[in-house]
Amino acid sequence: MRIGHGYDVHRFGEGDFITLGGVRIPHKHGLVAHSDGDVLLHALSDALLGAAALGDIGKHFPDTDPRFKGADSRALLRHVVAIVAEKGWKVGNVDATIVAQAPKMAPHIETMRGLIAEDLGVAVDQVNVKATTTERLGFTGREEGIAVHAVALLMAR
């Protein structure tokens, strides 16, 4: 077994929605990113890559590469799962914490879990997503952006 940790942050910018866990959520701002800015899927991808000792998403999908401009992070996550599997690993479970003052995540979490489970090729009960605020402290509390911590457990195939 192997464990990995992922962390990602994106700041708010222009736009009227964000994408988290593959779910489009209306919001007064968008997230600034080279890809679609799905900070949740980026953190999960990093956790999986870390557990397999395969680097991070910046190594596999550099923001200097125009092929990944506006990329669908669900497609990137599925690619990560494939390369992790090529190295002999399968997903045991993943757990993520979204750190954001707004928007409220609770109405979207079950949909996120379902989409993530689909992309990972696992059951929904192997995926946990939760959200918290920082009680208006720090950059997330000031609503300057969103952060996500994620952990992944990999098991030999």
Swiss-Prot record:
InterPro entries: MECDP_synthase, MECDP_synthase_CS, MECDP_synthase_sf
EC number, UniProt record: 4.6.1.12
Main function: Involved in the biosynthesis of isopentenyl diphosphate (IPP) and dimethylallyl diphosphate (DMAPP), two major building blocks of isoprenoid compounds. Catalyzes the conversion of 4-diphosphocytidyl-2-C-methyl-D-erythritol 2-phosphate (CDP-ME2P) to 2-C-methyl-D-erythritol 2,4-cyclodiphosphate (ME-CPP) with a corresponding release of cytidine 5-monophosphate (CMP).
Molecular function terms, GO-annotated: 2-C-methyl-D-erythritol 2,4-cyclodiphosphate synthase activity; metal ion binding
Residues marked Transition state stabilizer (site): H34, T133
Subunit structure: Homotrimer.
The record's free-text note on cofactor binding: Binds 1 divalent metal cation per subunit.
Protein name: 2-C-methyl-D-erythritol 2,4-cyclodiphosphate synthase
Swiss-Prot/TrEMBL keywords: Isoprene biosynthesis, Lyase, Metal-binding
A Pfam family that the UniProt record links to this protein: YgbB
Catalytic reaction list: 4-CDP-2-C-methyl-D-erythritol 2-phosphate = 2-C-methyl-D-erythritol 2,4-cyclic diphosphate + CMP
GO BP annotations, alphabetical order: isopentenyl diphosphate biosynthetic process, methylerythritol 4-phosphate pathway; terpenoid biosynthetic process
Pathway(s) it belongs to: Isoprenoid biosynthesis; isopentenyl diphosphate biosynthesis via DXP pathway; isopentenyl diphosphate from 1-deoxy-D-xylulose 5-phosphate: step 4/6
PANTHER family assigned to the protein according to its UniProt record, in alphabetical order: 2-C-METHYL-D-ERYTHRITOL 2,4-CYCLODIPHOSPHATE SYNTHASE, CHLOROPLASTIC
Record carries keyword tRNA processing: no
Annotated CDD domains: MECDP_synthase (cd00554)
Gene3D superfamilies xrefs: 2-C-methyl-D-erythritol 2,4-cyclodiphosphate synthase
HAMAP family, per the entry: IspF
Family: Belongs to the IspF family.
Binding residues annotated for a divalent metal cation, in chain numbering: D8, H10, H42
SUPFAM superfamilies: IpsF-like (SSF69765)
Cofactors named for this entry: a divalent metal cation
Superkingdom per UniProt: Bacteria
Binding site for 4-CDP-2-C-methyl-D-erythritol 2-phosphate: 8-10, 34-35, 56-58, 61-65, 100-106, 132-135, 139, 142
